[in-house]
C-alpha cells in the first residue's frame, strides 16, 4: 500500500535521503537499522529492522518462564514495541508502542527498580498508566547499542521489588543479547 510517492536521487556514495517527515512518522532515528531488499517486481524495499524481533519465540518463552517463577507480568520489548509478554496483564502490553519514559531508560543502557511506594513508576506503553506496584527494567545491550528491554511488573500489595527481580531481568537481558550474536 502506497501512502505517498517520493522521488529521490542517489548520490555518488549510494545514499538516498529519507525526508524528515517520513522518518518522524515511522519513528526512524539516526542510526536506526533498516533492511534493504528487492521485491520480485524489482522494487527496492526499506524495512525497519528489529534485532530483538528476530528472537520473538525465545523472548516469549523466556517471558513465560520468568512470569511463572515470579508471579509478575513480564514483557520483552524491541526499540519500538512490546514483542513478547506473559502474566496477568500481558494482553494489555503485547504489540503496543513503548512510552517515551521507557525509551529513555533503554537509551541509558542500564537496569533499574521503580515502585509505587517511591512514587517513581513509569508507563511501559503509550497511553498507559503505571498501575502495578513495582517494576524492574533492564536494557538489552548488543554491540554497545540498546536493542530493547526486559520489563517485570509486580502487582502484589507489598509494593516492593527485591533486588533479585532486578538481577532476574538483567539476566534475561544478557541472555537475549547473547542470542543476538
Predicted regions and their residues:
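Structured interaction and signal-relay segments at domain junctions
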Residues: 63-129
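Glycine-biased flexible loop/turn sites that connect beta-strands or occur in inter-domain linkers
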Residues: 144-145
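Juxtadomain coupling helices with adjacent low-complexity linkers
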Residues: 56, 60-65, 98, 102, ...
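Short, solvent-exposed cationic patches
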Residues: 40-42, 102-118, 169-180
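Short, small/polar residue-rich loop motifs at catalytic or cofactor-binding pockets
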Residues: 3-4, 68-71, 132-134
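A short, aliphatic-rich beta-strand micro-motif
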Residues: 134-141
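Intrinsically disordered, low-complexity terminal regulatory regions
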Residues: 7-84
